[in-house]
Amino acid sequence: MPLKFETYHPQGLVRVDDRYFMTSVEVTSAPVKCDPACDGYDRTPGAGIGHLFEFDAKGTLLHDLHLGSGTVYHPGGFDYDGRYLWVPVAEYRPNSRATVYRIDPVTFSAVPFLQVPDHIGGVVHDTANNRFVGMNWGSRTFYVWGPSGQPQRKVANPEQFVDFQDCHYLPAGKAVCGGVASLTVGSTPVQLGGLSLLDLRTLDAVNTVPMTGLTPAGNSVTRNPVWLSTDRGALTLQVVPDDDQSVLYTYRAG
């Protein structure tokens, strides 16, 4: 389904009944790599606008909420717990900083919930254990916060298959995470996608499935926004892999 609006660089996706919510980053000035490091970072912060889009089942834009402040403008993968959307917005560079917002999907009221001294690219609300799990740039590190945002754990991610881009809570303390690994085979660049079932207590991947499908633009189908659900006995995967003039792809099995 073509989306009937400028999507910029999509990041995360949630479906609520017949509506969709999607985060995206609009870069107005791209970060520039620094060598040597600039102010302790490997690149400049750049500039941009964070978006939380709401659109309907026909791809028509209903709302566009701007998120972030100053150099914090990069929304990531996000979660919905039946009441609120939990959306991280970070600087567009590793080892930086982020704000996690609690957003009412009806009123679009956005309240800063948590400040983190790192780039947070995804958040899951673990309702079974009454806590939040986040991941940093490339999902190399997991963070665990209590119900009020108090830090509880910081753990290296043992999963080396793909960098998680978008994760969502599943009942009984699990999460499904989609992501991509950008590889070079010989001299050929390759995007290898994947889906992982994550145990939110141990933070280990219970199962991981490679996803080799590519869009006509050459992007892995799990490159960024991923939404997985069961629909009338079928497993449904919905993804938005491409930038700017994007298409929502739907795959069903079962």
Locations of the language-model features?
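Loop/turn-rich, solvent-exposed surfaces of beta-rich toroidal or solenoidal domains
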Residues: E159-D204
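Repeated scaffold domains used in trafficking and secretory/extracellular systems
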Residues: T7-G12, G70-D79, V116-T127, Q160-Y169, ...
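Short, conserved, GDST-rich strand-edge loop motifs in beta-rich repeat architectures
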Residues: T23-A47, A90-P94, G179-G193, V247-Y251
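Beta-strand-rich domains and repeat architectures in extracellular enzymes and scaffolds
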Residues: P2-Y41, H74-G77, Q245
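Blade-level signature of beta-propeller repeat domains, shared across WD40, Kelch, NHL, RCC1
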Residues: V221-G254
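A short beta-strand motif characteristic of beta-propeller blades
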Residues: M1-L3, T60-G68, S109-L114, Q150-N157, ...
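Short coil/turn segments that connect the beta-strands within blades of beta-propeller domains
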Residues: D17-R19, G82-R83, A128-N130, A172-K174, ...
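Beta-propeller blade signature
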Residues: A37-K58, A98-V106, V190-L203, T250-G254
